Amino acid sequence: MKGMNMKARGLFLLLACLALMGGGMPRQNVFRLSGMVVDTEGRGIGGVVVNDGVGFALTGADGRWALVTDTFRSKFVSISTPAGFRLPQDSGLAAGFFVPVGRAVAGGGWRFVLERRPVAADSFYYVAVSDPQVRNASDVARWRGEAVASLRSTVAALSRSREVVGVALGDLVFDDMGLFDDYAGSVAGMPMTMFQCIGNHDFDRRLPALRHAPEGAPAYAEMAYHRRFGPTDYSFNIGRVHIVTMCNIDYRGGGRYAELLSDSQLSWLERDLSYVPRGSLVILNMHAPGWNREGAAANIDNAPRLERALSGYRVHVFCGHTHFFQNVEVGDSLYQHNIGAASGAWWSGDVNRCGAPNGYMVAAVDGDSISWRYVASDRSADSRMRVWAPGTFAGHEGFVVANVWDYDSRCRVEWMQGGRPMGGMERFVGVDRGPSPRGAGAAAVPTSHLFRCRPRPGGGRVTVVVTDRFGGRSYGEVLADGTVRLWSGRG
């Protein structure tokens, strides 16, 4: 309990005593749970994957399922919604795909009801938002007025052509569980189905997580999150894609945690993926990254084991936690998007610690292919870079410098002077010199998505041309008076 304050320690010991005493009577904790998965006409749906976080079952042709569940270890039974059915939701928030085990026990089982899709959703949009991390009324106002306002506009436009699915990648709040309802209310009512992932600041600091609590403890750190949003490890299917969300924060209480997936979680993931055809496109959502090259201290401890569990699939990992932007091509079939935070550097300014603007990611899925673009909350969705004129980026005074936050190895960053192509810009590691985040703990960090070129004095205007892996082009032009103009187009 090192690091826990006296109040938290006292509460922890009280819960431990209550769990051990149990009123002097042993409590039954293992039950055979059963039920059905049916459509809106009451017909059983066969082949649906059901799990309680430990054990798995597949519904029979009649839609029936059964699991033997230890309610001390498992808090939910959930289904992996099949692609042929709509994602269940309530006012835009994902719901209806899980049931608390206590309710299933009290009700003698549970019936999940799914609505059949009239047509397959092989093409859809996927919106990933990282770290809203609101801690007070001021943060909530900025979250609603900036990120949510932008999200509502973006989602409204996207939903006119395709279904939209969203995920918040953890740290919905900043240690104040009372703000969960504010977060939920802010994203409700949009024309999309919004899922959640738990982050380290979504745990109750006074308690350890369930896996570290005394057996049968009446309270644990993720209980408030469970009550509001459901399980922390779950999956679903849409179109030809399998989507998994997992908690990779091992929370010990008092703000202490490790970034990792437990052995039992990795076994759960392997079981979940065993029902998915090899070679499928898989999206994995988690809070902390696995493979960052800068800021690697925030990576999960057992990333190699996770990589092995994901082998055989084409995987895109979406994560947050770091408050900077970094793409990592882990392998030919594994790509990590550590996206910029919606809160930037904890609402201390308008940028993340790497200089990327506060924003979110929009991915377009077509069959088994995926493309993506980052959307800045306060600027054009097509703005993919920031550009500095010579003399305005400290330490590189003779250079034009560009920060290209969504850069990866298949992106080209080139420049022209006076309309003449000059080749590729030089990539370097440095600290963004733009509008810096303010406040303790929000300091800028080195990033490798910076580029520079040295123009010839009097050689005419300089144009930076960024071509992404999908052929989209963005331009930054430095005029003679040092003014910078940005715009986007196609290749």
Residue ranges and their predicted role:
Residues 83-90, 95-102, 177-278, 297-318, ...:
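Extended active-site neighborhood of metal-dependent phosphoesterases/phosphodiesterases
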Residues 54-68, 426-433:
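Short, acidic Ser/Thr/Gly-rich low-complexity loop/linker segments typical of extracellular
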Residues 31-34, 39-54:
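Short, ordered, surface-exposed loop/turn motifs in non-cytosolic proteins
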Residues 25-32, 41, 86-180, 460:
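N-terminal active-site segment of His-dependent metallophosphoesterases
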Residues 431-454:
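Aromatic sugar-binding surface patches on proteins
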Residues 48-52, 77, 413-415:
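Hydrophobic beta-strand segments
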Residues 334-407, 411-417, 448-479:
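Binuclear metal-dependent phosphoesterase catalytic core
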Residues 35, 59-73, 112, 421, ...:
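Glycine-centered loop-to-beta-strand initiation motif
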